[in-house]
Swiss-Prot record:
Pfam family, one: GidB
Superkingdom classification of source: Bacteria
Keyword entries, A-Z: Cytoplasm, Methyltransferase, rRNA processing, S-adenosyl-L-methionine, Transferase
Name of the coding gene: rsmG
Protein name: Ribosomal RNA small subunit methyltransferase G
EC number: 2.1.1.170
GO molecular function terms noted in the UniProt entry: rRNA (guanine-N7-)-methyltransferase activity
Reactions this protein catalyses: guanosine(527) in 16S rRNA + S-adenosyl-L-methionine = N(7)-methylguanosine(527) in 16S rRNA + S-adenosyl-L-homocysteine
Length: 193
């Protein structure tokens, strides 16, 4: 995949700084990953797929003033969304020190003033309402709904990055949409869809 070409074909406008930020992010990720094993993705093509996967939702997400990403890991999707949405305050929650340090380093190196890195488990954070809550964590949708309770209200949207099993995980009482792209299923939950 040619990442830049694929991103330019998206039905959205990315900030002028986006491609420079992505390039620097990738350079740092490859260096850090050799020492700290931040992600299982080791080659450029896989990283490019992860980046595309992370930024794709800006084609359908509403504009928002703040976003919480639960379990950001090496930056997917929260950090990538922050680069694509510079007007949105993005809080990245990552309990592992090595990953949180990497996120903090990227924030400082790229001057991402819209990013806040929190090195905690989301369960240990004080409640605060966010307009959008995201997660690419490999846990059940019901668990994500439980973890996000103190961070959303009736107007908030939840965006969970899921695979094929999403259909087995969704409660029919939820108001949701599933946006499918290749093997990815973006589960968008909210009262006002």
């Amino acid at each position: 995949m040619n990442l830049k070409t694929a991103l330019l074909e998206l039905d959205t406008e990315l900030p002028d700084t986006f491609f420079h930020h992505i390039q620097k992010f990738k350079e740092h990720l490859f260096k850090w990953n050799k020492i700290h094993n931040l992600t299982g993705a080791k080659d450029e093509n896989t990283i490019d797929e992860f980046i595309y996967d992370a930024i794709y939702p800006i084609t359908f997400l509403p504009k928002c003033k703040n976003l919480l990403d639960i379990g950001t890991g090496a930056g997917f999707p929260g950090l990538i969304l922050a680069m694509g949405l510079p007007e949105t305050e993005v809080t990245l929650v990552e309990p592992l020190a090595k990953r949180a340090s990497f996120l903090q380093f990227i924030k400082a190196d790229l001057g991402l003033s819209n990013v806040k890195v929190v090195q905690k488990r989301v369960q240990d954070m004080p409640s605060e309402i966010f307009e959008i809550v995201t997660s690419r964590a490999v846990i059940d949708t019901n668990m994500l709904l439980e973890l996000s309770k103190g961070f959303r209200n009736k107007d908030s949207k939840l965006l969970f990055f899921k695979g094929e099993r999403v259909y087995d995980e969704v409660n029919k009482d939820l108001k949701y949409k599933i946006i499918k792209r290749e093997n990815r299923h973006y589960l968008l939950i909210g009262e006002t869809l």
